[in-house]
Regions:
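Surface-exposed beta-loop interaction hotspot
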Residues: 82-107
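Alpha-helical transmembrane segments in multipass membrane proteins, preferentially the mid-helix core
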Residues: 15-27, 77-82, 116-130, 185-192
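Hydrophobic alpha-helical transmembrane segments of multi-pass membrane proteins
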Residues: 8-21, 34-57, 66, 70, ...
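C-terminal transmembrane-bundle signature of multipass membrane proteins
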Residues: 61-86, 122, 146-210
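Alpha-helical transmembrane segments of multi-pass integral membrane proteins
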Residues: 44-45, 75-76, 105-121, 141-150
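Membrane-interface helix-boundary motifs at transmembrane edges
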Residues: 25-36, 58-59, 87-91, 127-137
Length: 210
């Protein structure tokens, strides 16, 4: 029951957070529009993951939408790092054909974990490069690092690799909800200050609405 409620809360928080990048994607006319579009796709894809999780469709959520959202997140990290400094990076796609749903879920969890580790490396690097805790680059990197750690913890807990004997419930999902609340607050506060005092939401990039 707790896990179902956490999926529902996460979906609501994510949809609220998605309003800002969706609005910016529709209004912006410069290259930053690509960045906000990719961020929007990540948010909505992950929201769908929580919706199917809320309805108990574990195989569809963890086997399709979770790794898909992580792949989009990696793409976002590559594009964002390209705005800061051009860098040649590549992500190899692999296709696995299996027939057993349980085996499929296990393999997709393994693939998701690998993708999460790739994303973790990208955003740790971005956070270290930022060196300014007030910058968008640092704040979104911290959100994603916390989110990734929550996802990895959840996968390891479900797989039985780690056990929290003193704690109840899905610890990874609880960390995930906290990170999404932080993410939503960060987006809305930056949007508020952008509208009120004309400050760019993303430092070094023109986010002026036309």
């Amino acid at each position: 029951m707790l896990e179902t409620n956490l999926h529902f809360i996460s979906a609501i928080v994510i949809f609220l957070a998605a309003i800002v990048p969706i609005y910016l994607t529709l209004k912006l006319k410069n290259n930053i529009r690509k960045l906000t579009l990719i961020l929007t796709i990540f948010i909505l894809t992950h929201a769908v993951y929580h919706i199917v999780g809320f309805y108990g469709l574990t195989l569809l959520g963890e086997g399709v939408f979770e790794p898909l959202s992580v792949a989009v997140l990696i793409f976002f990290g590559i594009i964002y790092s390209g705005f800061a400094k051009p860098k040649n990076m590549g992500v190899k796609n692999s296709m696995v054909v299996v027939w057993n749903p349980g085996t499929l879920l296990l393999l997709m969890n393994s693939i998701t974990t690998l993708l999460l580790l790739v994303a973790l490396g990208i955003f740790v690097w971005l956070a270290v490069r930022s060196r300014n805790i007030r910058s968008f680059q640092f704040q979104i990197s911290i959100f994603i690092i916390i989110w990734i750690l929550g996802e990895i913890t959840g996968i390891l807990q479900v797989s039985g690799i780690i056990v929290f004997t003193a704690l109840q419930g899905d610890i990874g999902l609880e960390i995930h909800v906290v990170s999404m609340v932080f993410f939503g607050m960060m987006l809305w506060l930056r949007f508020y200050y952008s509208e009120r005092i004309g400050k760019n939401m993303i430092e070094g990039l023109d986010t002026t609405l036309r």
